[in-house]
Amino acid sequence: MASVSANPLPRLILYHQTTHDPDGNLISILPLITQPEIRLTHIIVAAIHINEDPDGLTLNDRPPSDPRFTTLWAELRIAQASGITVLGMLGGAAKGSYTRLDADAASFERYYAPLAALIRARGLQGLDLDVEEPMSLGGVVRLVDRLRGDFGPGFVITLAPVATALLDPRRNLSGFDYAALEAMRGPQIAWYNAQFYCGWGDAHTPLLYEMCVARGWDPAKLVMGLVTTPDNGAGWVPFEVLAVTLRMLALRFPRFGGVMGWEYFNGRPGGKGRPWEWAQAMTRLLGTAGPGHAAVAAAESQAKPSPPVEIDPDSEQGVQVPIPRSFEYHTDDDNSDEDSK
């Protein structure tokens, strides 16, 4: 394994949700560690769901303690030991998690406690908040504050807005205004995994990313989210086109925040047989070699608590807009773990 880089940016992030093939065989993440020329900084395991029963927390559609996930959790520990930061993803296309966390204080405590217990039990180093249902600004601030208070300054808190939400709160799946959240709790949020796909952004050119920066977003905190294959959603960008976009962003923004990919198991060019090749391709396009994991983790652990801010629970929410393409949630009855993000 190559030595750790002193440069914490750009990040290279992969979501890992489809953890097993249709026959129930584990899709191993170990090649992301053992294969050459991969500089992966973060893995985000998805998707954690808070269900009606507060004690019925699930990873996709099974309890996180299900024997099906035993090897998955072990491999994630190996990834951590190799310097890759491992986060969980809460929410996604399946609704309900954030509605339950956005209720009164007593309800919040009931639903939050099992989530916190899961983070501790599995040694997750952070949580990605993928809010794809209406949530109040006060509700998301309360959640961020509680995570920071419970898990300390080294815990990585990220959010996953659609890219357009960073320009216009009306083009948003989350309800709250991300600019307002950044103004109130920016020091607590490590970065934003902005979705530049499925009709909510375009990575064929650097234009939308540049517009976000012009609007005031720090490029070091703005990660360009991509689909790793056309099978994972509209907006896939061929590598030769993406190379130009990333080169332009790196030249214009020396502290470019990096890229994330949705998701690992079938990414091009290797597809299901060699899914790690997407990370190899991105490592080349980003112009990096060798894992820079420790430097990234050190840079992200500098968040400091911010003073409390009075939140109006009746503050105006962003307008919910329709998802531009059909999303389907596949359960194990369909022999799949897939939950479109």
Which sequence ranges carry the predicted segments?
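Short glycine-rich, acidic/polar surface loops and turns
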Residues: T245-L249
